[in-house]
């Protein structure tokens, strides 16, 4: 695992140095920063430590593979590393076990893998995990449901409340309907039972 480091008087200066020295873009890395107080003859400095997203995803994959082997399952992995969204796709000998009811096991695996990366590399990496494209298909269903519900709300002028969803799923709904003319959305409730309301403007 390659570790990149730089320092500067400000975060911006330290980060700019790191990107230039290593010929990388901000979208390729994740970094943490530490403020170091200067002494009598030294200025304050900001220390930047960074890792490549691709290598962090590979470490997360290793962690997940060991976890899945502990369940007596075999798995293959596919890493999609894009600047806007990073996904680790899993294809196992028993996908239903890894998916769980309503995708709860996928979510648990995701939390564990993210925590592993944070604990070992001190970066908050919000990558996602999918099993046999379950999440991709569910995302499409949620977007389709949101749009169908919005059309019904426009027609009847009666607000609609969707079932409770994760924060990621609620963001999908808000995003899908952000340009839907005459409709507005907001979320209510407390986790893990927070839900989205679709209503006319």
Predicted ranges, named:
Residues 1-201:
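RNA-contacting regions in translation and RNA-metabolism proteins
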């Amino acid at each position: 695992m390659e570790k990149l480091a730089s320092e500067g008087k400000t975060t911006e200066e330290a980060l700019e140095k790191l990107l230039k020295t290593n010929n990388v873009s901000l979208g390729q890395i994740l970094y943490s920063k530490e403020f170091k107080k200067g002494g009598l003859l030294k200025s304050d400095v900001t220390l930047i430590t960074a890792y490549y997203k691709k290598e962090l995803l590979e470490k997360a994959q290793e962690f997940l593979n060991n976890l899945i082997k502990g369940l007596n399952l075999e798995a293959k992995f596919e890493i999609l590393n894009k600047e806007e969204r990073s996904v680790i796709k899993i294809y196992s000998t028993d996908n239903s076990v890894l998916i769980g009811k309503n995708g709860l096991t996928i979510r648990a695996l995701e939390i564990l893998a993210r925590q592993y990366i944070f604990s070992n590399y001190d970066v908050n990496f919000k990558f996602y995990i999918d099993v046999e494209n379950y999440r991709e298909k569910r995302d499409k269903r949620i977007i389709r449901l949101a749009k169908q519900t919005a059309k019904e709300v426009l027609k009847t002028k009666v607000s609609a409340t969707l079932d409770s969803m994760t924060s990621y799923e609620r963001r999908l709904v808000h995003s899908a309907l952000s340009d839907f003319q005459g409709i507005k959305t907001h979320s209510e409730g407390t986790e893990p039972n927070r839900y989205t309301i679709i209503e006319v403007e």
